[in-house]
């Protein structure tokens, strides 16, 4: 069973001078050795959580637990937590070695031990041999690695990263995503990463917290959040989406765009107003009148791996489609999608209500699915038995026919000598 390393219990943060509440009753548990991401727009409260964990801000209410100890009153330098800031906060007047060794020198660690641990840390971030290099001579990615090496040199329980990739160019940022994830897994310590970049959050994390206006709107694995957004905000914030108003006719049957469609969601009231989400990559073009409905292509952009196409249906709903096929602006085409592509969102549903509903109807599906599986297995066995019996009967018939043929041949052979004897006597 995984150990809880950090816990927030009903934590809030209010700035008294402006009476502004930036965190509202936040509660969560983080397990040791996992990669967590706090994802949200500016002002959502994500960096406030990071600073409270680091000891740079005090919580107004609630308890902050680190490694089973309440740390609300523990100074920042007494917490086994390190922070990597967006600016990296490296010392430009020191070389790489001295930057990485700084914390150990302050603690009075033996010089040989310092040299050993600096070497180990630089190897982990692939900067061995850079010990004497000036900080001012390093690239952005190399500075990032030095900051990480300095942060991990005394093996903190938790590493906090505050928008630490945002200063890098796109290619280097993608490369560092792989390196950070690999480093976290090799070290086995807890990473808490703050970003406004959805791609970074989805690519690196074991678990993502979506934040908005000081609250956690939804949390889950990257796949869960992308495939099952809880509300309009999450669906719109994570990736690109087509979001429409609709009505849940009954379980697994939804109405939108003036039509009824088979879906895979359930657990809602009949005729309940809902919102429908369909991702642009889950839609494909057909000939007119051969899909679910027709749209008219309005614009398209080439994005390298796909065309991003905007089209409008007869109700003037905008549709975003990702396609590897180029469209013709102004043409009418059909749109099609599978039932699995339709995600249903209830209006004003909390994360707790969402989780309970999903669990309830998934268990229902699993029970029905098991019964169906048993029934199908029994039917298959019965069919196999019937086939075996049929084959045995056919074999028996073939054997009977063969036996009759053999008997006829033997009888014929027995009769032939008698005929020959009669002919021989007549000749004499």
Curated annotation (Swiss-Prot):
GO terms for molecular function: ABC-type polyamine transporter activity; ATP binding; ATP hydrolysis activity. It is a peripheral membrane protein. Its main location: membrane. The complex is composed of two ATP-binding proteins (PotA), two transmembrane proteins (PotB and PotC) and a solute-binding protein (PotD). Part of the ABC transporter complex PotABCD involved in spermidine/putrescine import. Responsible for energy coupling to the transport system. Belongs to the ABC transporter superfamily. Spermidine/putrescine importer (TC 3.A.1.11.1) family. This is Spermidine/putrescine import ATP-binding protein PotA.
């Amino acid at each position: 069973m995984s150990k809880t390393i950090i816990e927030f219990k009903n934590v809030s943060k209010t700035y008294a001078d402006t009476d502004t509440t930036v965190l509202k009753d936040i509660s969560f548990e983080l397990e040791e050795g996992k990669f967590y991401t706090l994802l949200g727009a500016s002002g959502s409260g994500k960096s406030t959580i990071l600073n409270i964990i680091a000891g740079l801000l005090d919580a107004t209410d609630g308890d902050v637990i680190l490694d089973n100890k309440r740390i609300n009153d523990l100074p920042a330098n007494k917490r086994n937590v390190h922070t990597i800031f967006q600016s990296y906060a490296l010392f430009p007047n020191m070389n790489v070695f001295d930057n990485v060794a700084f914390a150990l020198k302050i603690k009075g660690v033996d010089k040989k031990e310092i040299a050993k641990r600096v070497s180990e840390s630089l190897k982990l971030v692939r900067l061995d041999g850079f010990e004497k290099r000036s900080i001012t001579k390093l690239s952005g990615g190399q500075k990032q690695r030095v900051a990480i090496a300095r942060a991990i040199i005394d093996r903190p329980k938790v590493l906090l990263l505050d928008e630490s990739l945002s200063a890098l160019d796109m290619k280097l940022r993608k490369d560092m995503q792989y390196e950070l994830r690999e480093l976290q897994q090799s070290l086995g310590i807890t990473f808490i990463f703050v970003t406004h970049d959805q791609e970074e959050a989805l690519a690196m994390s074991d678990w993502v917290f979506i934040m908005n206006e000081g609250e956690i709107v939804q949390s889950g694995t990257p796949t869960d959040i992308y495939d099952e957004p809880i509300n309009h905000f999450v669906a719109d914030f994570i990736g690109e989406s087509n979001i429409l108003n609709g009505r849940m006719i009954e379980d697994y049957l939804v109405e939108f765009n003036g039509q009824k469609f088979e879906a895979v969601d359930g657990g809602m009231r009949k005729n309940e107003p809902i919102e429908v989400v369909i991702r642009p990559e889950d839609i494909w073009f057909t000939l007119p009148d051969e899909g679910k409905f027709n749209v008219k292509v309005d614009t398209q952009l080439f994005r390298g791996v796909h065309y991003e196409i905007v089209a409008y249906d007869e109700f003037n709903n905008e549709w975003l489609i990702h396609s590897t096929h180029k469209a013709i602006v102004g043409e009418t085409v059909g749109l099609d999608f599978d039932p699995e592509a339709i995600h249903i969102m209830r209006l004003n549903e909390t994360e707790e209500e969402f989780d309970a509903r999903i669990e309830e109807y998934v268990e229902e599906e699993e029970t029905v699915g098991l019964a169906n599986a048993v029934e199908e297995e029994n039917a298959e066995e019965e069919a196999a038995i019937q086939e075996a019996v049929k084959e045995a009967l056919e074999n028996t018939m073939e054997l009977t026919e063969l036996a009759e043929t053999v008997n006829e041949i033997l009888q014929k052979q027995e009769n032939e000598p008698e005929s020959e004897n009669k002919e021989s006597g007549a000749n004499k």
